Structure formats: C-alpha cells, structure tokens
C-alpha cells in the first residue's frame, strides 16, 4: 500500500504548543497539527529504549506526519522567548541580570525591585492565572527577586548567596520549604507547568505571525 507523504514534508500550515509531550501528542494529532512545539521533549540524556508507551507516541507522530520540536534549558534562558524573561515581564519586572551558572549557562534572572510580598504574589498569580504556594522565610518588604522557572526549588540556597530575598520558581522538593525559612528567603512556588507555559506560547505565536499559519496552545495542566 502506498502511503501519502507525511504532512511535515509538505510544509507546515498549523502549529501547536504545550509544556509537555505525553498525551498532548495525541491531542495534536487529532487536531491535525503539522508542528508540535514542546518544552519537555521525548528524549533526554543517554541512549533510550523505544518501546511501550514511548514507541506508541513516536509511531503515532510519524504515521500522522506531525513534526515535534522541543527546547528545554535554551528556552528557559532565552532573552526573547525564554520562560524566565517572559514570566518576569508578565509580573512587571524589568532590567534583570543573569545569575547561577549551570553547564556554561546562566539559568536565572535577578531583579532589584522593591515591593510588598502580598502585592508580588498577586502579580504572579495574575501572570499565571493560578495560585502560588509560599514559603514565607523572608521579610514582608522585598528588595531583590530571583526567577528560575520549572523545578528549581533546590536552588534557593544559590539564590540566597546572591543576596536574593525572594525566589520564584515552579516547584521544589519538600525540604526546600524549611530550607528557605532557614535561609531567610521568601520561596514562591508558582507551579512547574504554569511557570513554563510562557516560552512555548511565544514561539508558536511568533511562528504563526511570521509564516502566516494557524497556531494554538494545547493546555494539559498537571496542577504541579
């Protein structure tokens, strides 16, 4: 039987984006998307056996002709499309400076910004359209804010060394709550998923505008 060429070899007429890839792949296929842009890709470091659920997802993508593009850390730290930059902008922060080096990249942004803690939380919740969880280790009046989106709660110690009194991230292990209290830092968990929606949305919108194609965001929240 002769199969038609995959859609991805015929040009892209529609794009969709999401933070994760798992069930979103099937949603994108059902929506007849040509290009799926995700933050967390299919493959990570090292060799990986392709079987079970992973095999099914890859096969479904190939059979449908849908291309998948993923960008993890580079998307977190990008100066224009990055999660850190875009979340900061949505909160109302400007003039950030990079901090915390990881494998040659500065993965965080810090800001001099005086604000009451209650007001900052309100601005963050407005930016993500959701609720945050606070470890109230620092003072009510905030002077320096650090941001690393995703699962960077364990970096609260590095943030404290930078003189950051309020650290915003997505999530962290249980011990990071008490660690923040010990360090005298306000640690704000904004949700791993919600804090990483900014970049993929921006890229999809940019591609849609530049190439005049339909783009959409496939929301598949985890609540974490």
Indicate where each model-derived feature is located.
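Active-site catalytic microenvironments in core metabolic enzymes, especially phosphate/sugar-handling
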Residues: 14-224
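Single conserved hydrophobic/aromatic residue that forms the stacking wall/gate
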Residues: 1-16, 20
């Amino acid at each position: 039987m002769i199969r038609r060429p995959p859609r991805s070899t015929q040009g892209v007429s529609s794009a969709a984006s999401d933070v994760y890839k798992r069930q979103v792949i099937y949603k994108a296929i059902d929506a007849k998307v040509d290009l799926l842009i995700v933050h967390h890709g299919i493959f990570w470091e090292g060799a990986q056996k392709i079987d079970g659920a992973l095999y099914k997802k890859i096969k479904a993508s190939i059979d449908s002709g849908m291309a998948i593009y993923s960008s993890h850390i580079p998307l977190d730290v990008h100066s224009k499309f990055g999660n850190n930059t875009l979340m900061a902008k949505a909160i109302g922060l400007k003039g950030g400076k990079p901090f915390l080096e990881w494998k040659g990249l500065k993965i965080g942004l810090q800001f001099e910004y005086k604000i009451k803690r209650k007001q900052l939380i309100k601005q963050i919740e407005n930016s993500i359209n959701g609720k945050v969880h606070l470890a109230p280790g620092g003072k009510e009046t905030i002077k320096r804010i650090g941001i690393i989106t995703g699962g960077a709660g364990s970096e609260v110690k590095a943030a404290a060394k930078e003189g950051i009194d309020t650290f915003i991230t997505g999530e962290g292990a249980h011990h990071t709550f008490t660690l923040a209290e010990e360090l005298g830092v306000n640690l704000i968990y904004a949700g791993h998923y919600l804090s990483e929606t900014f970049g993929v949305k921006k890229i999809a919108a940019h591609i849609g505008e530049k190439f005049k194609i339909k783009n959409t965001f496939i929301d598949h929240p985890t609540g974490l």
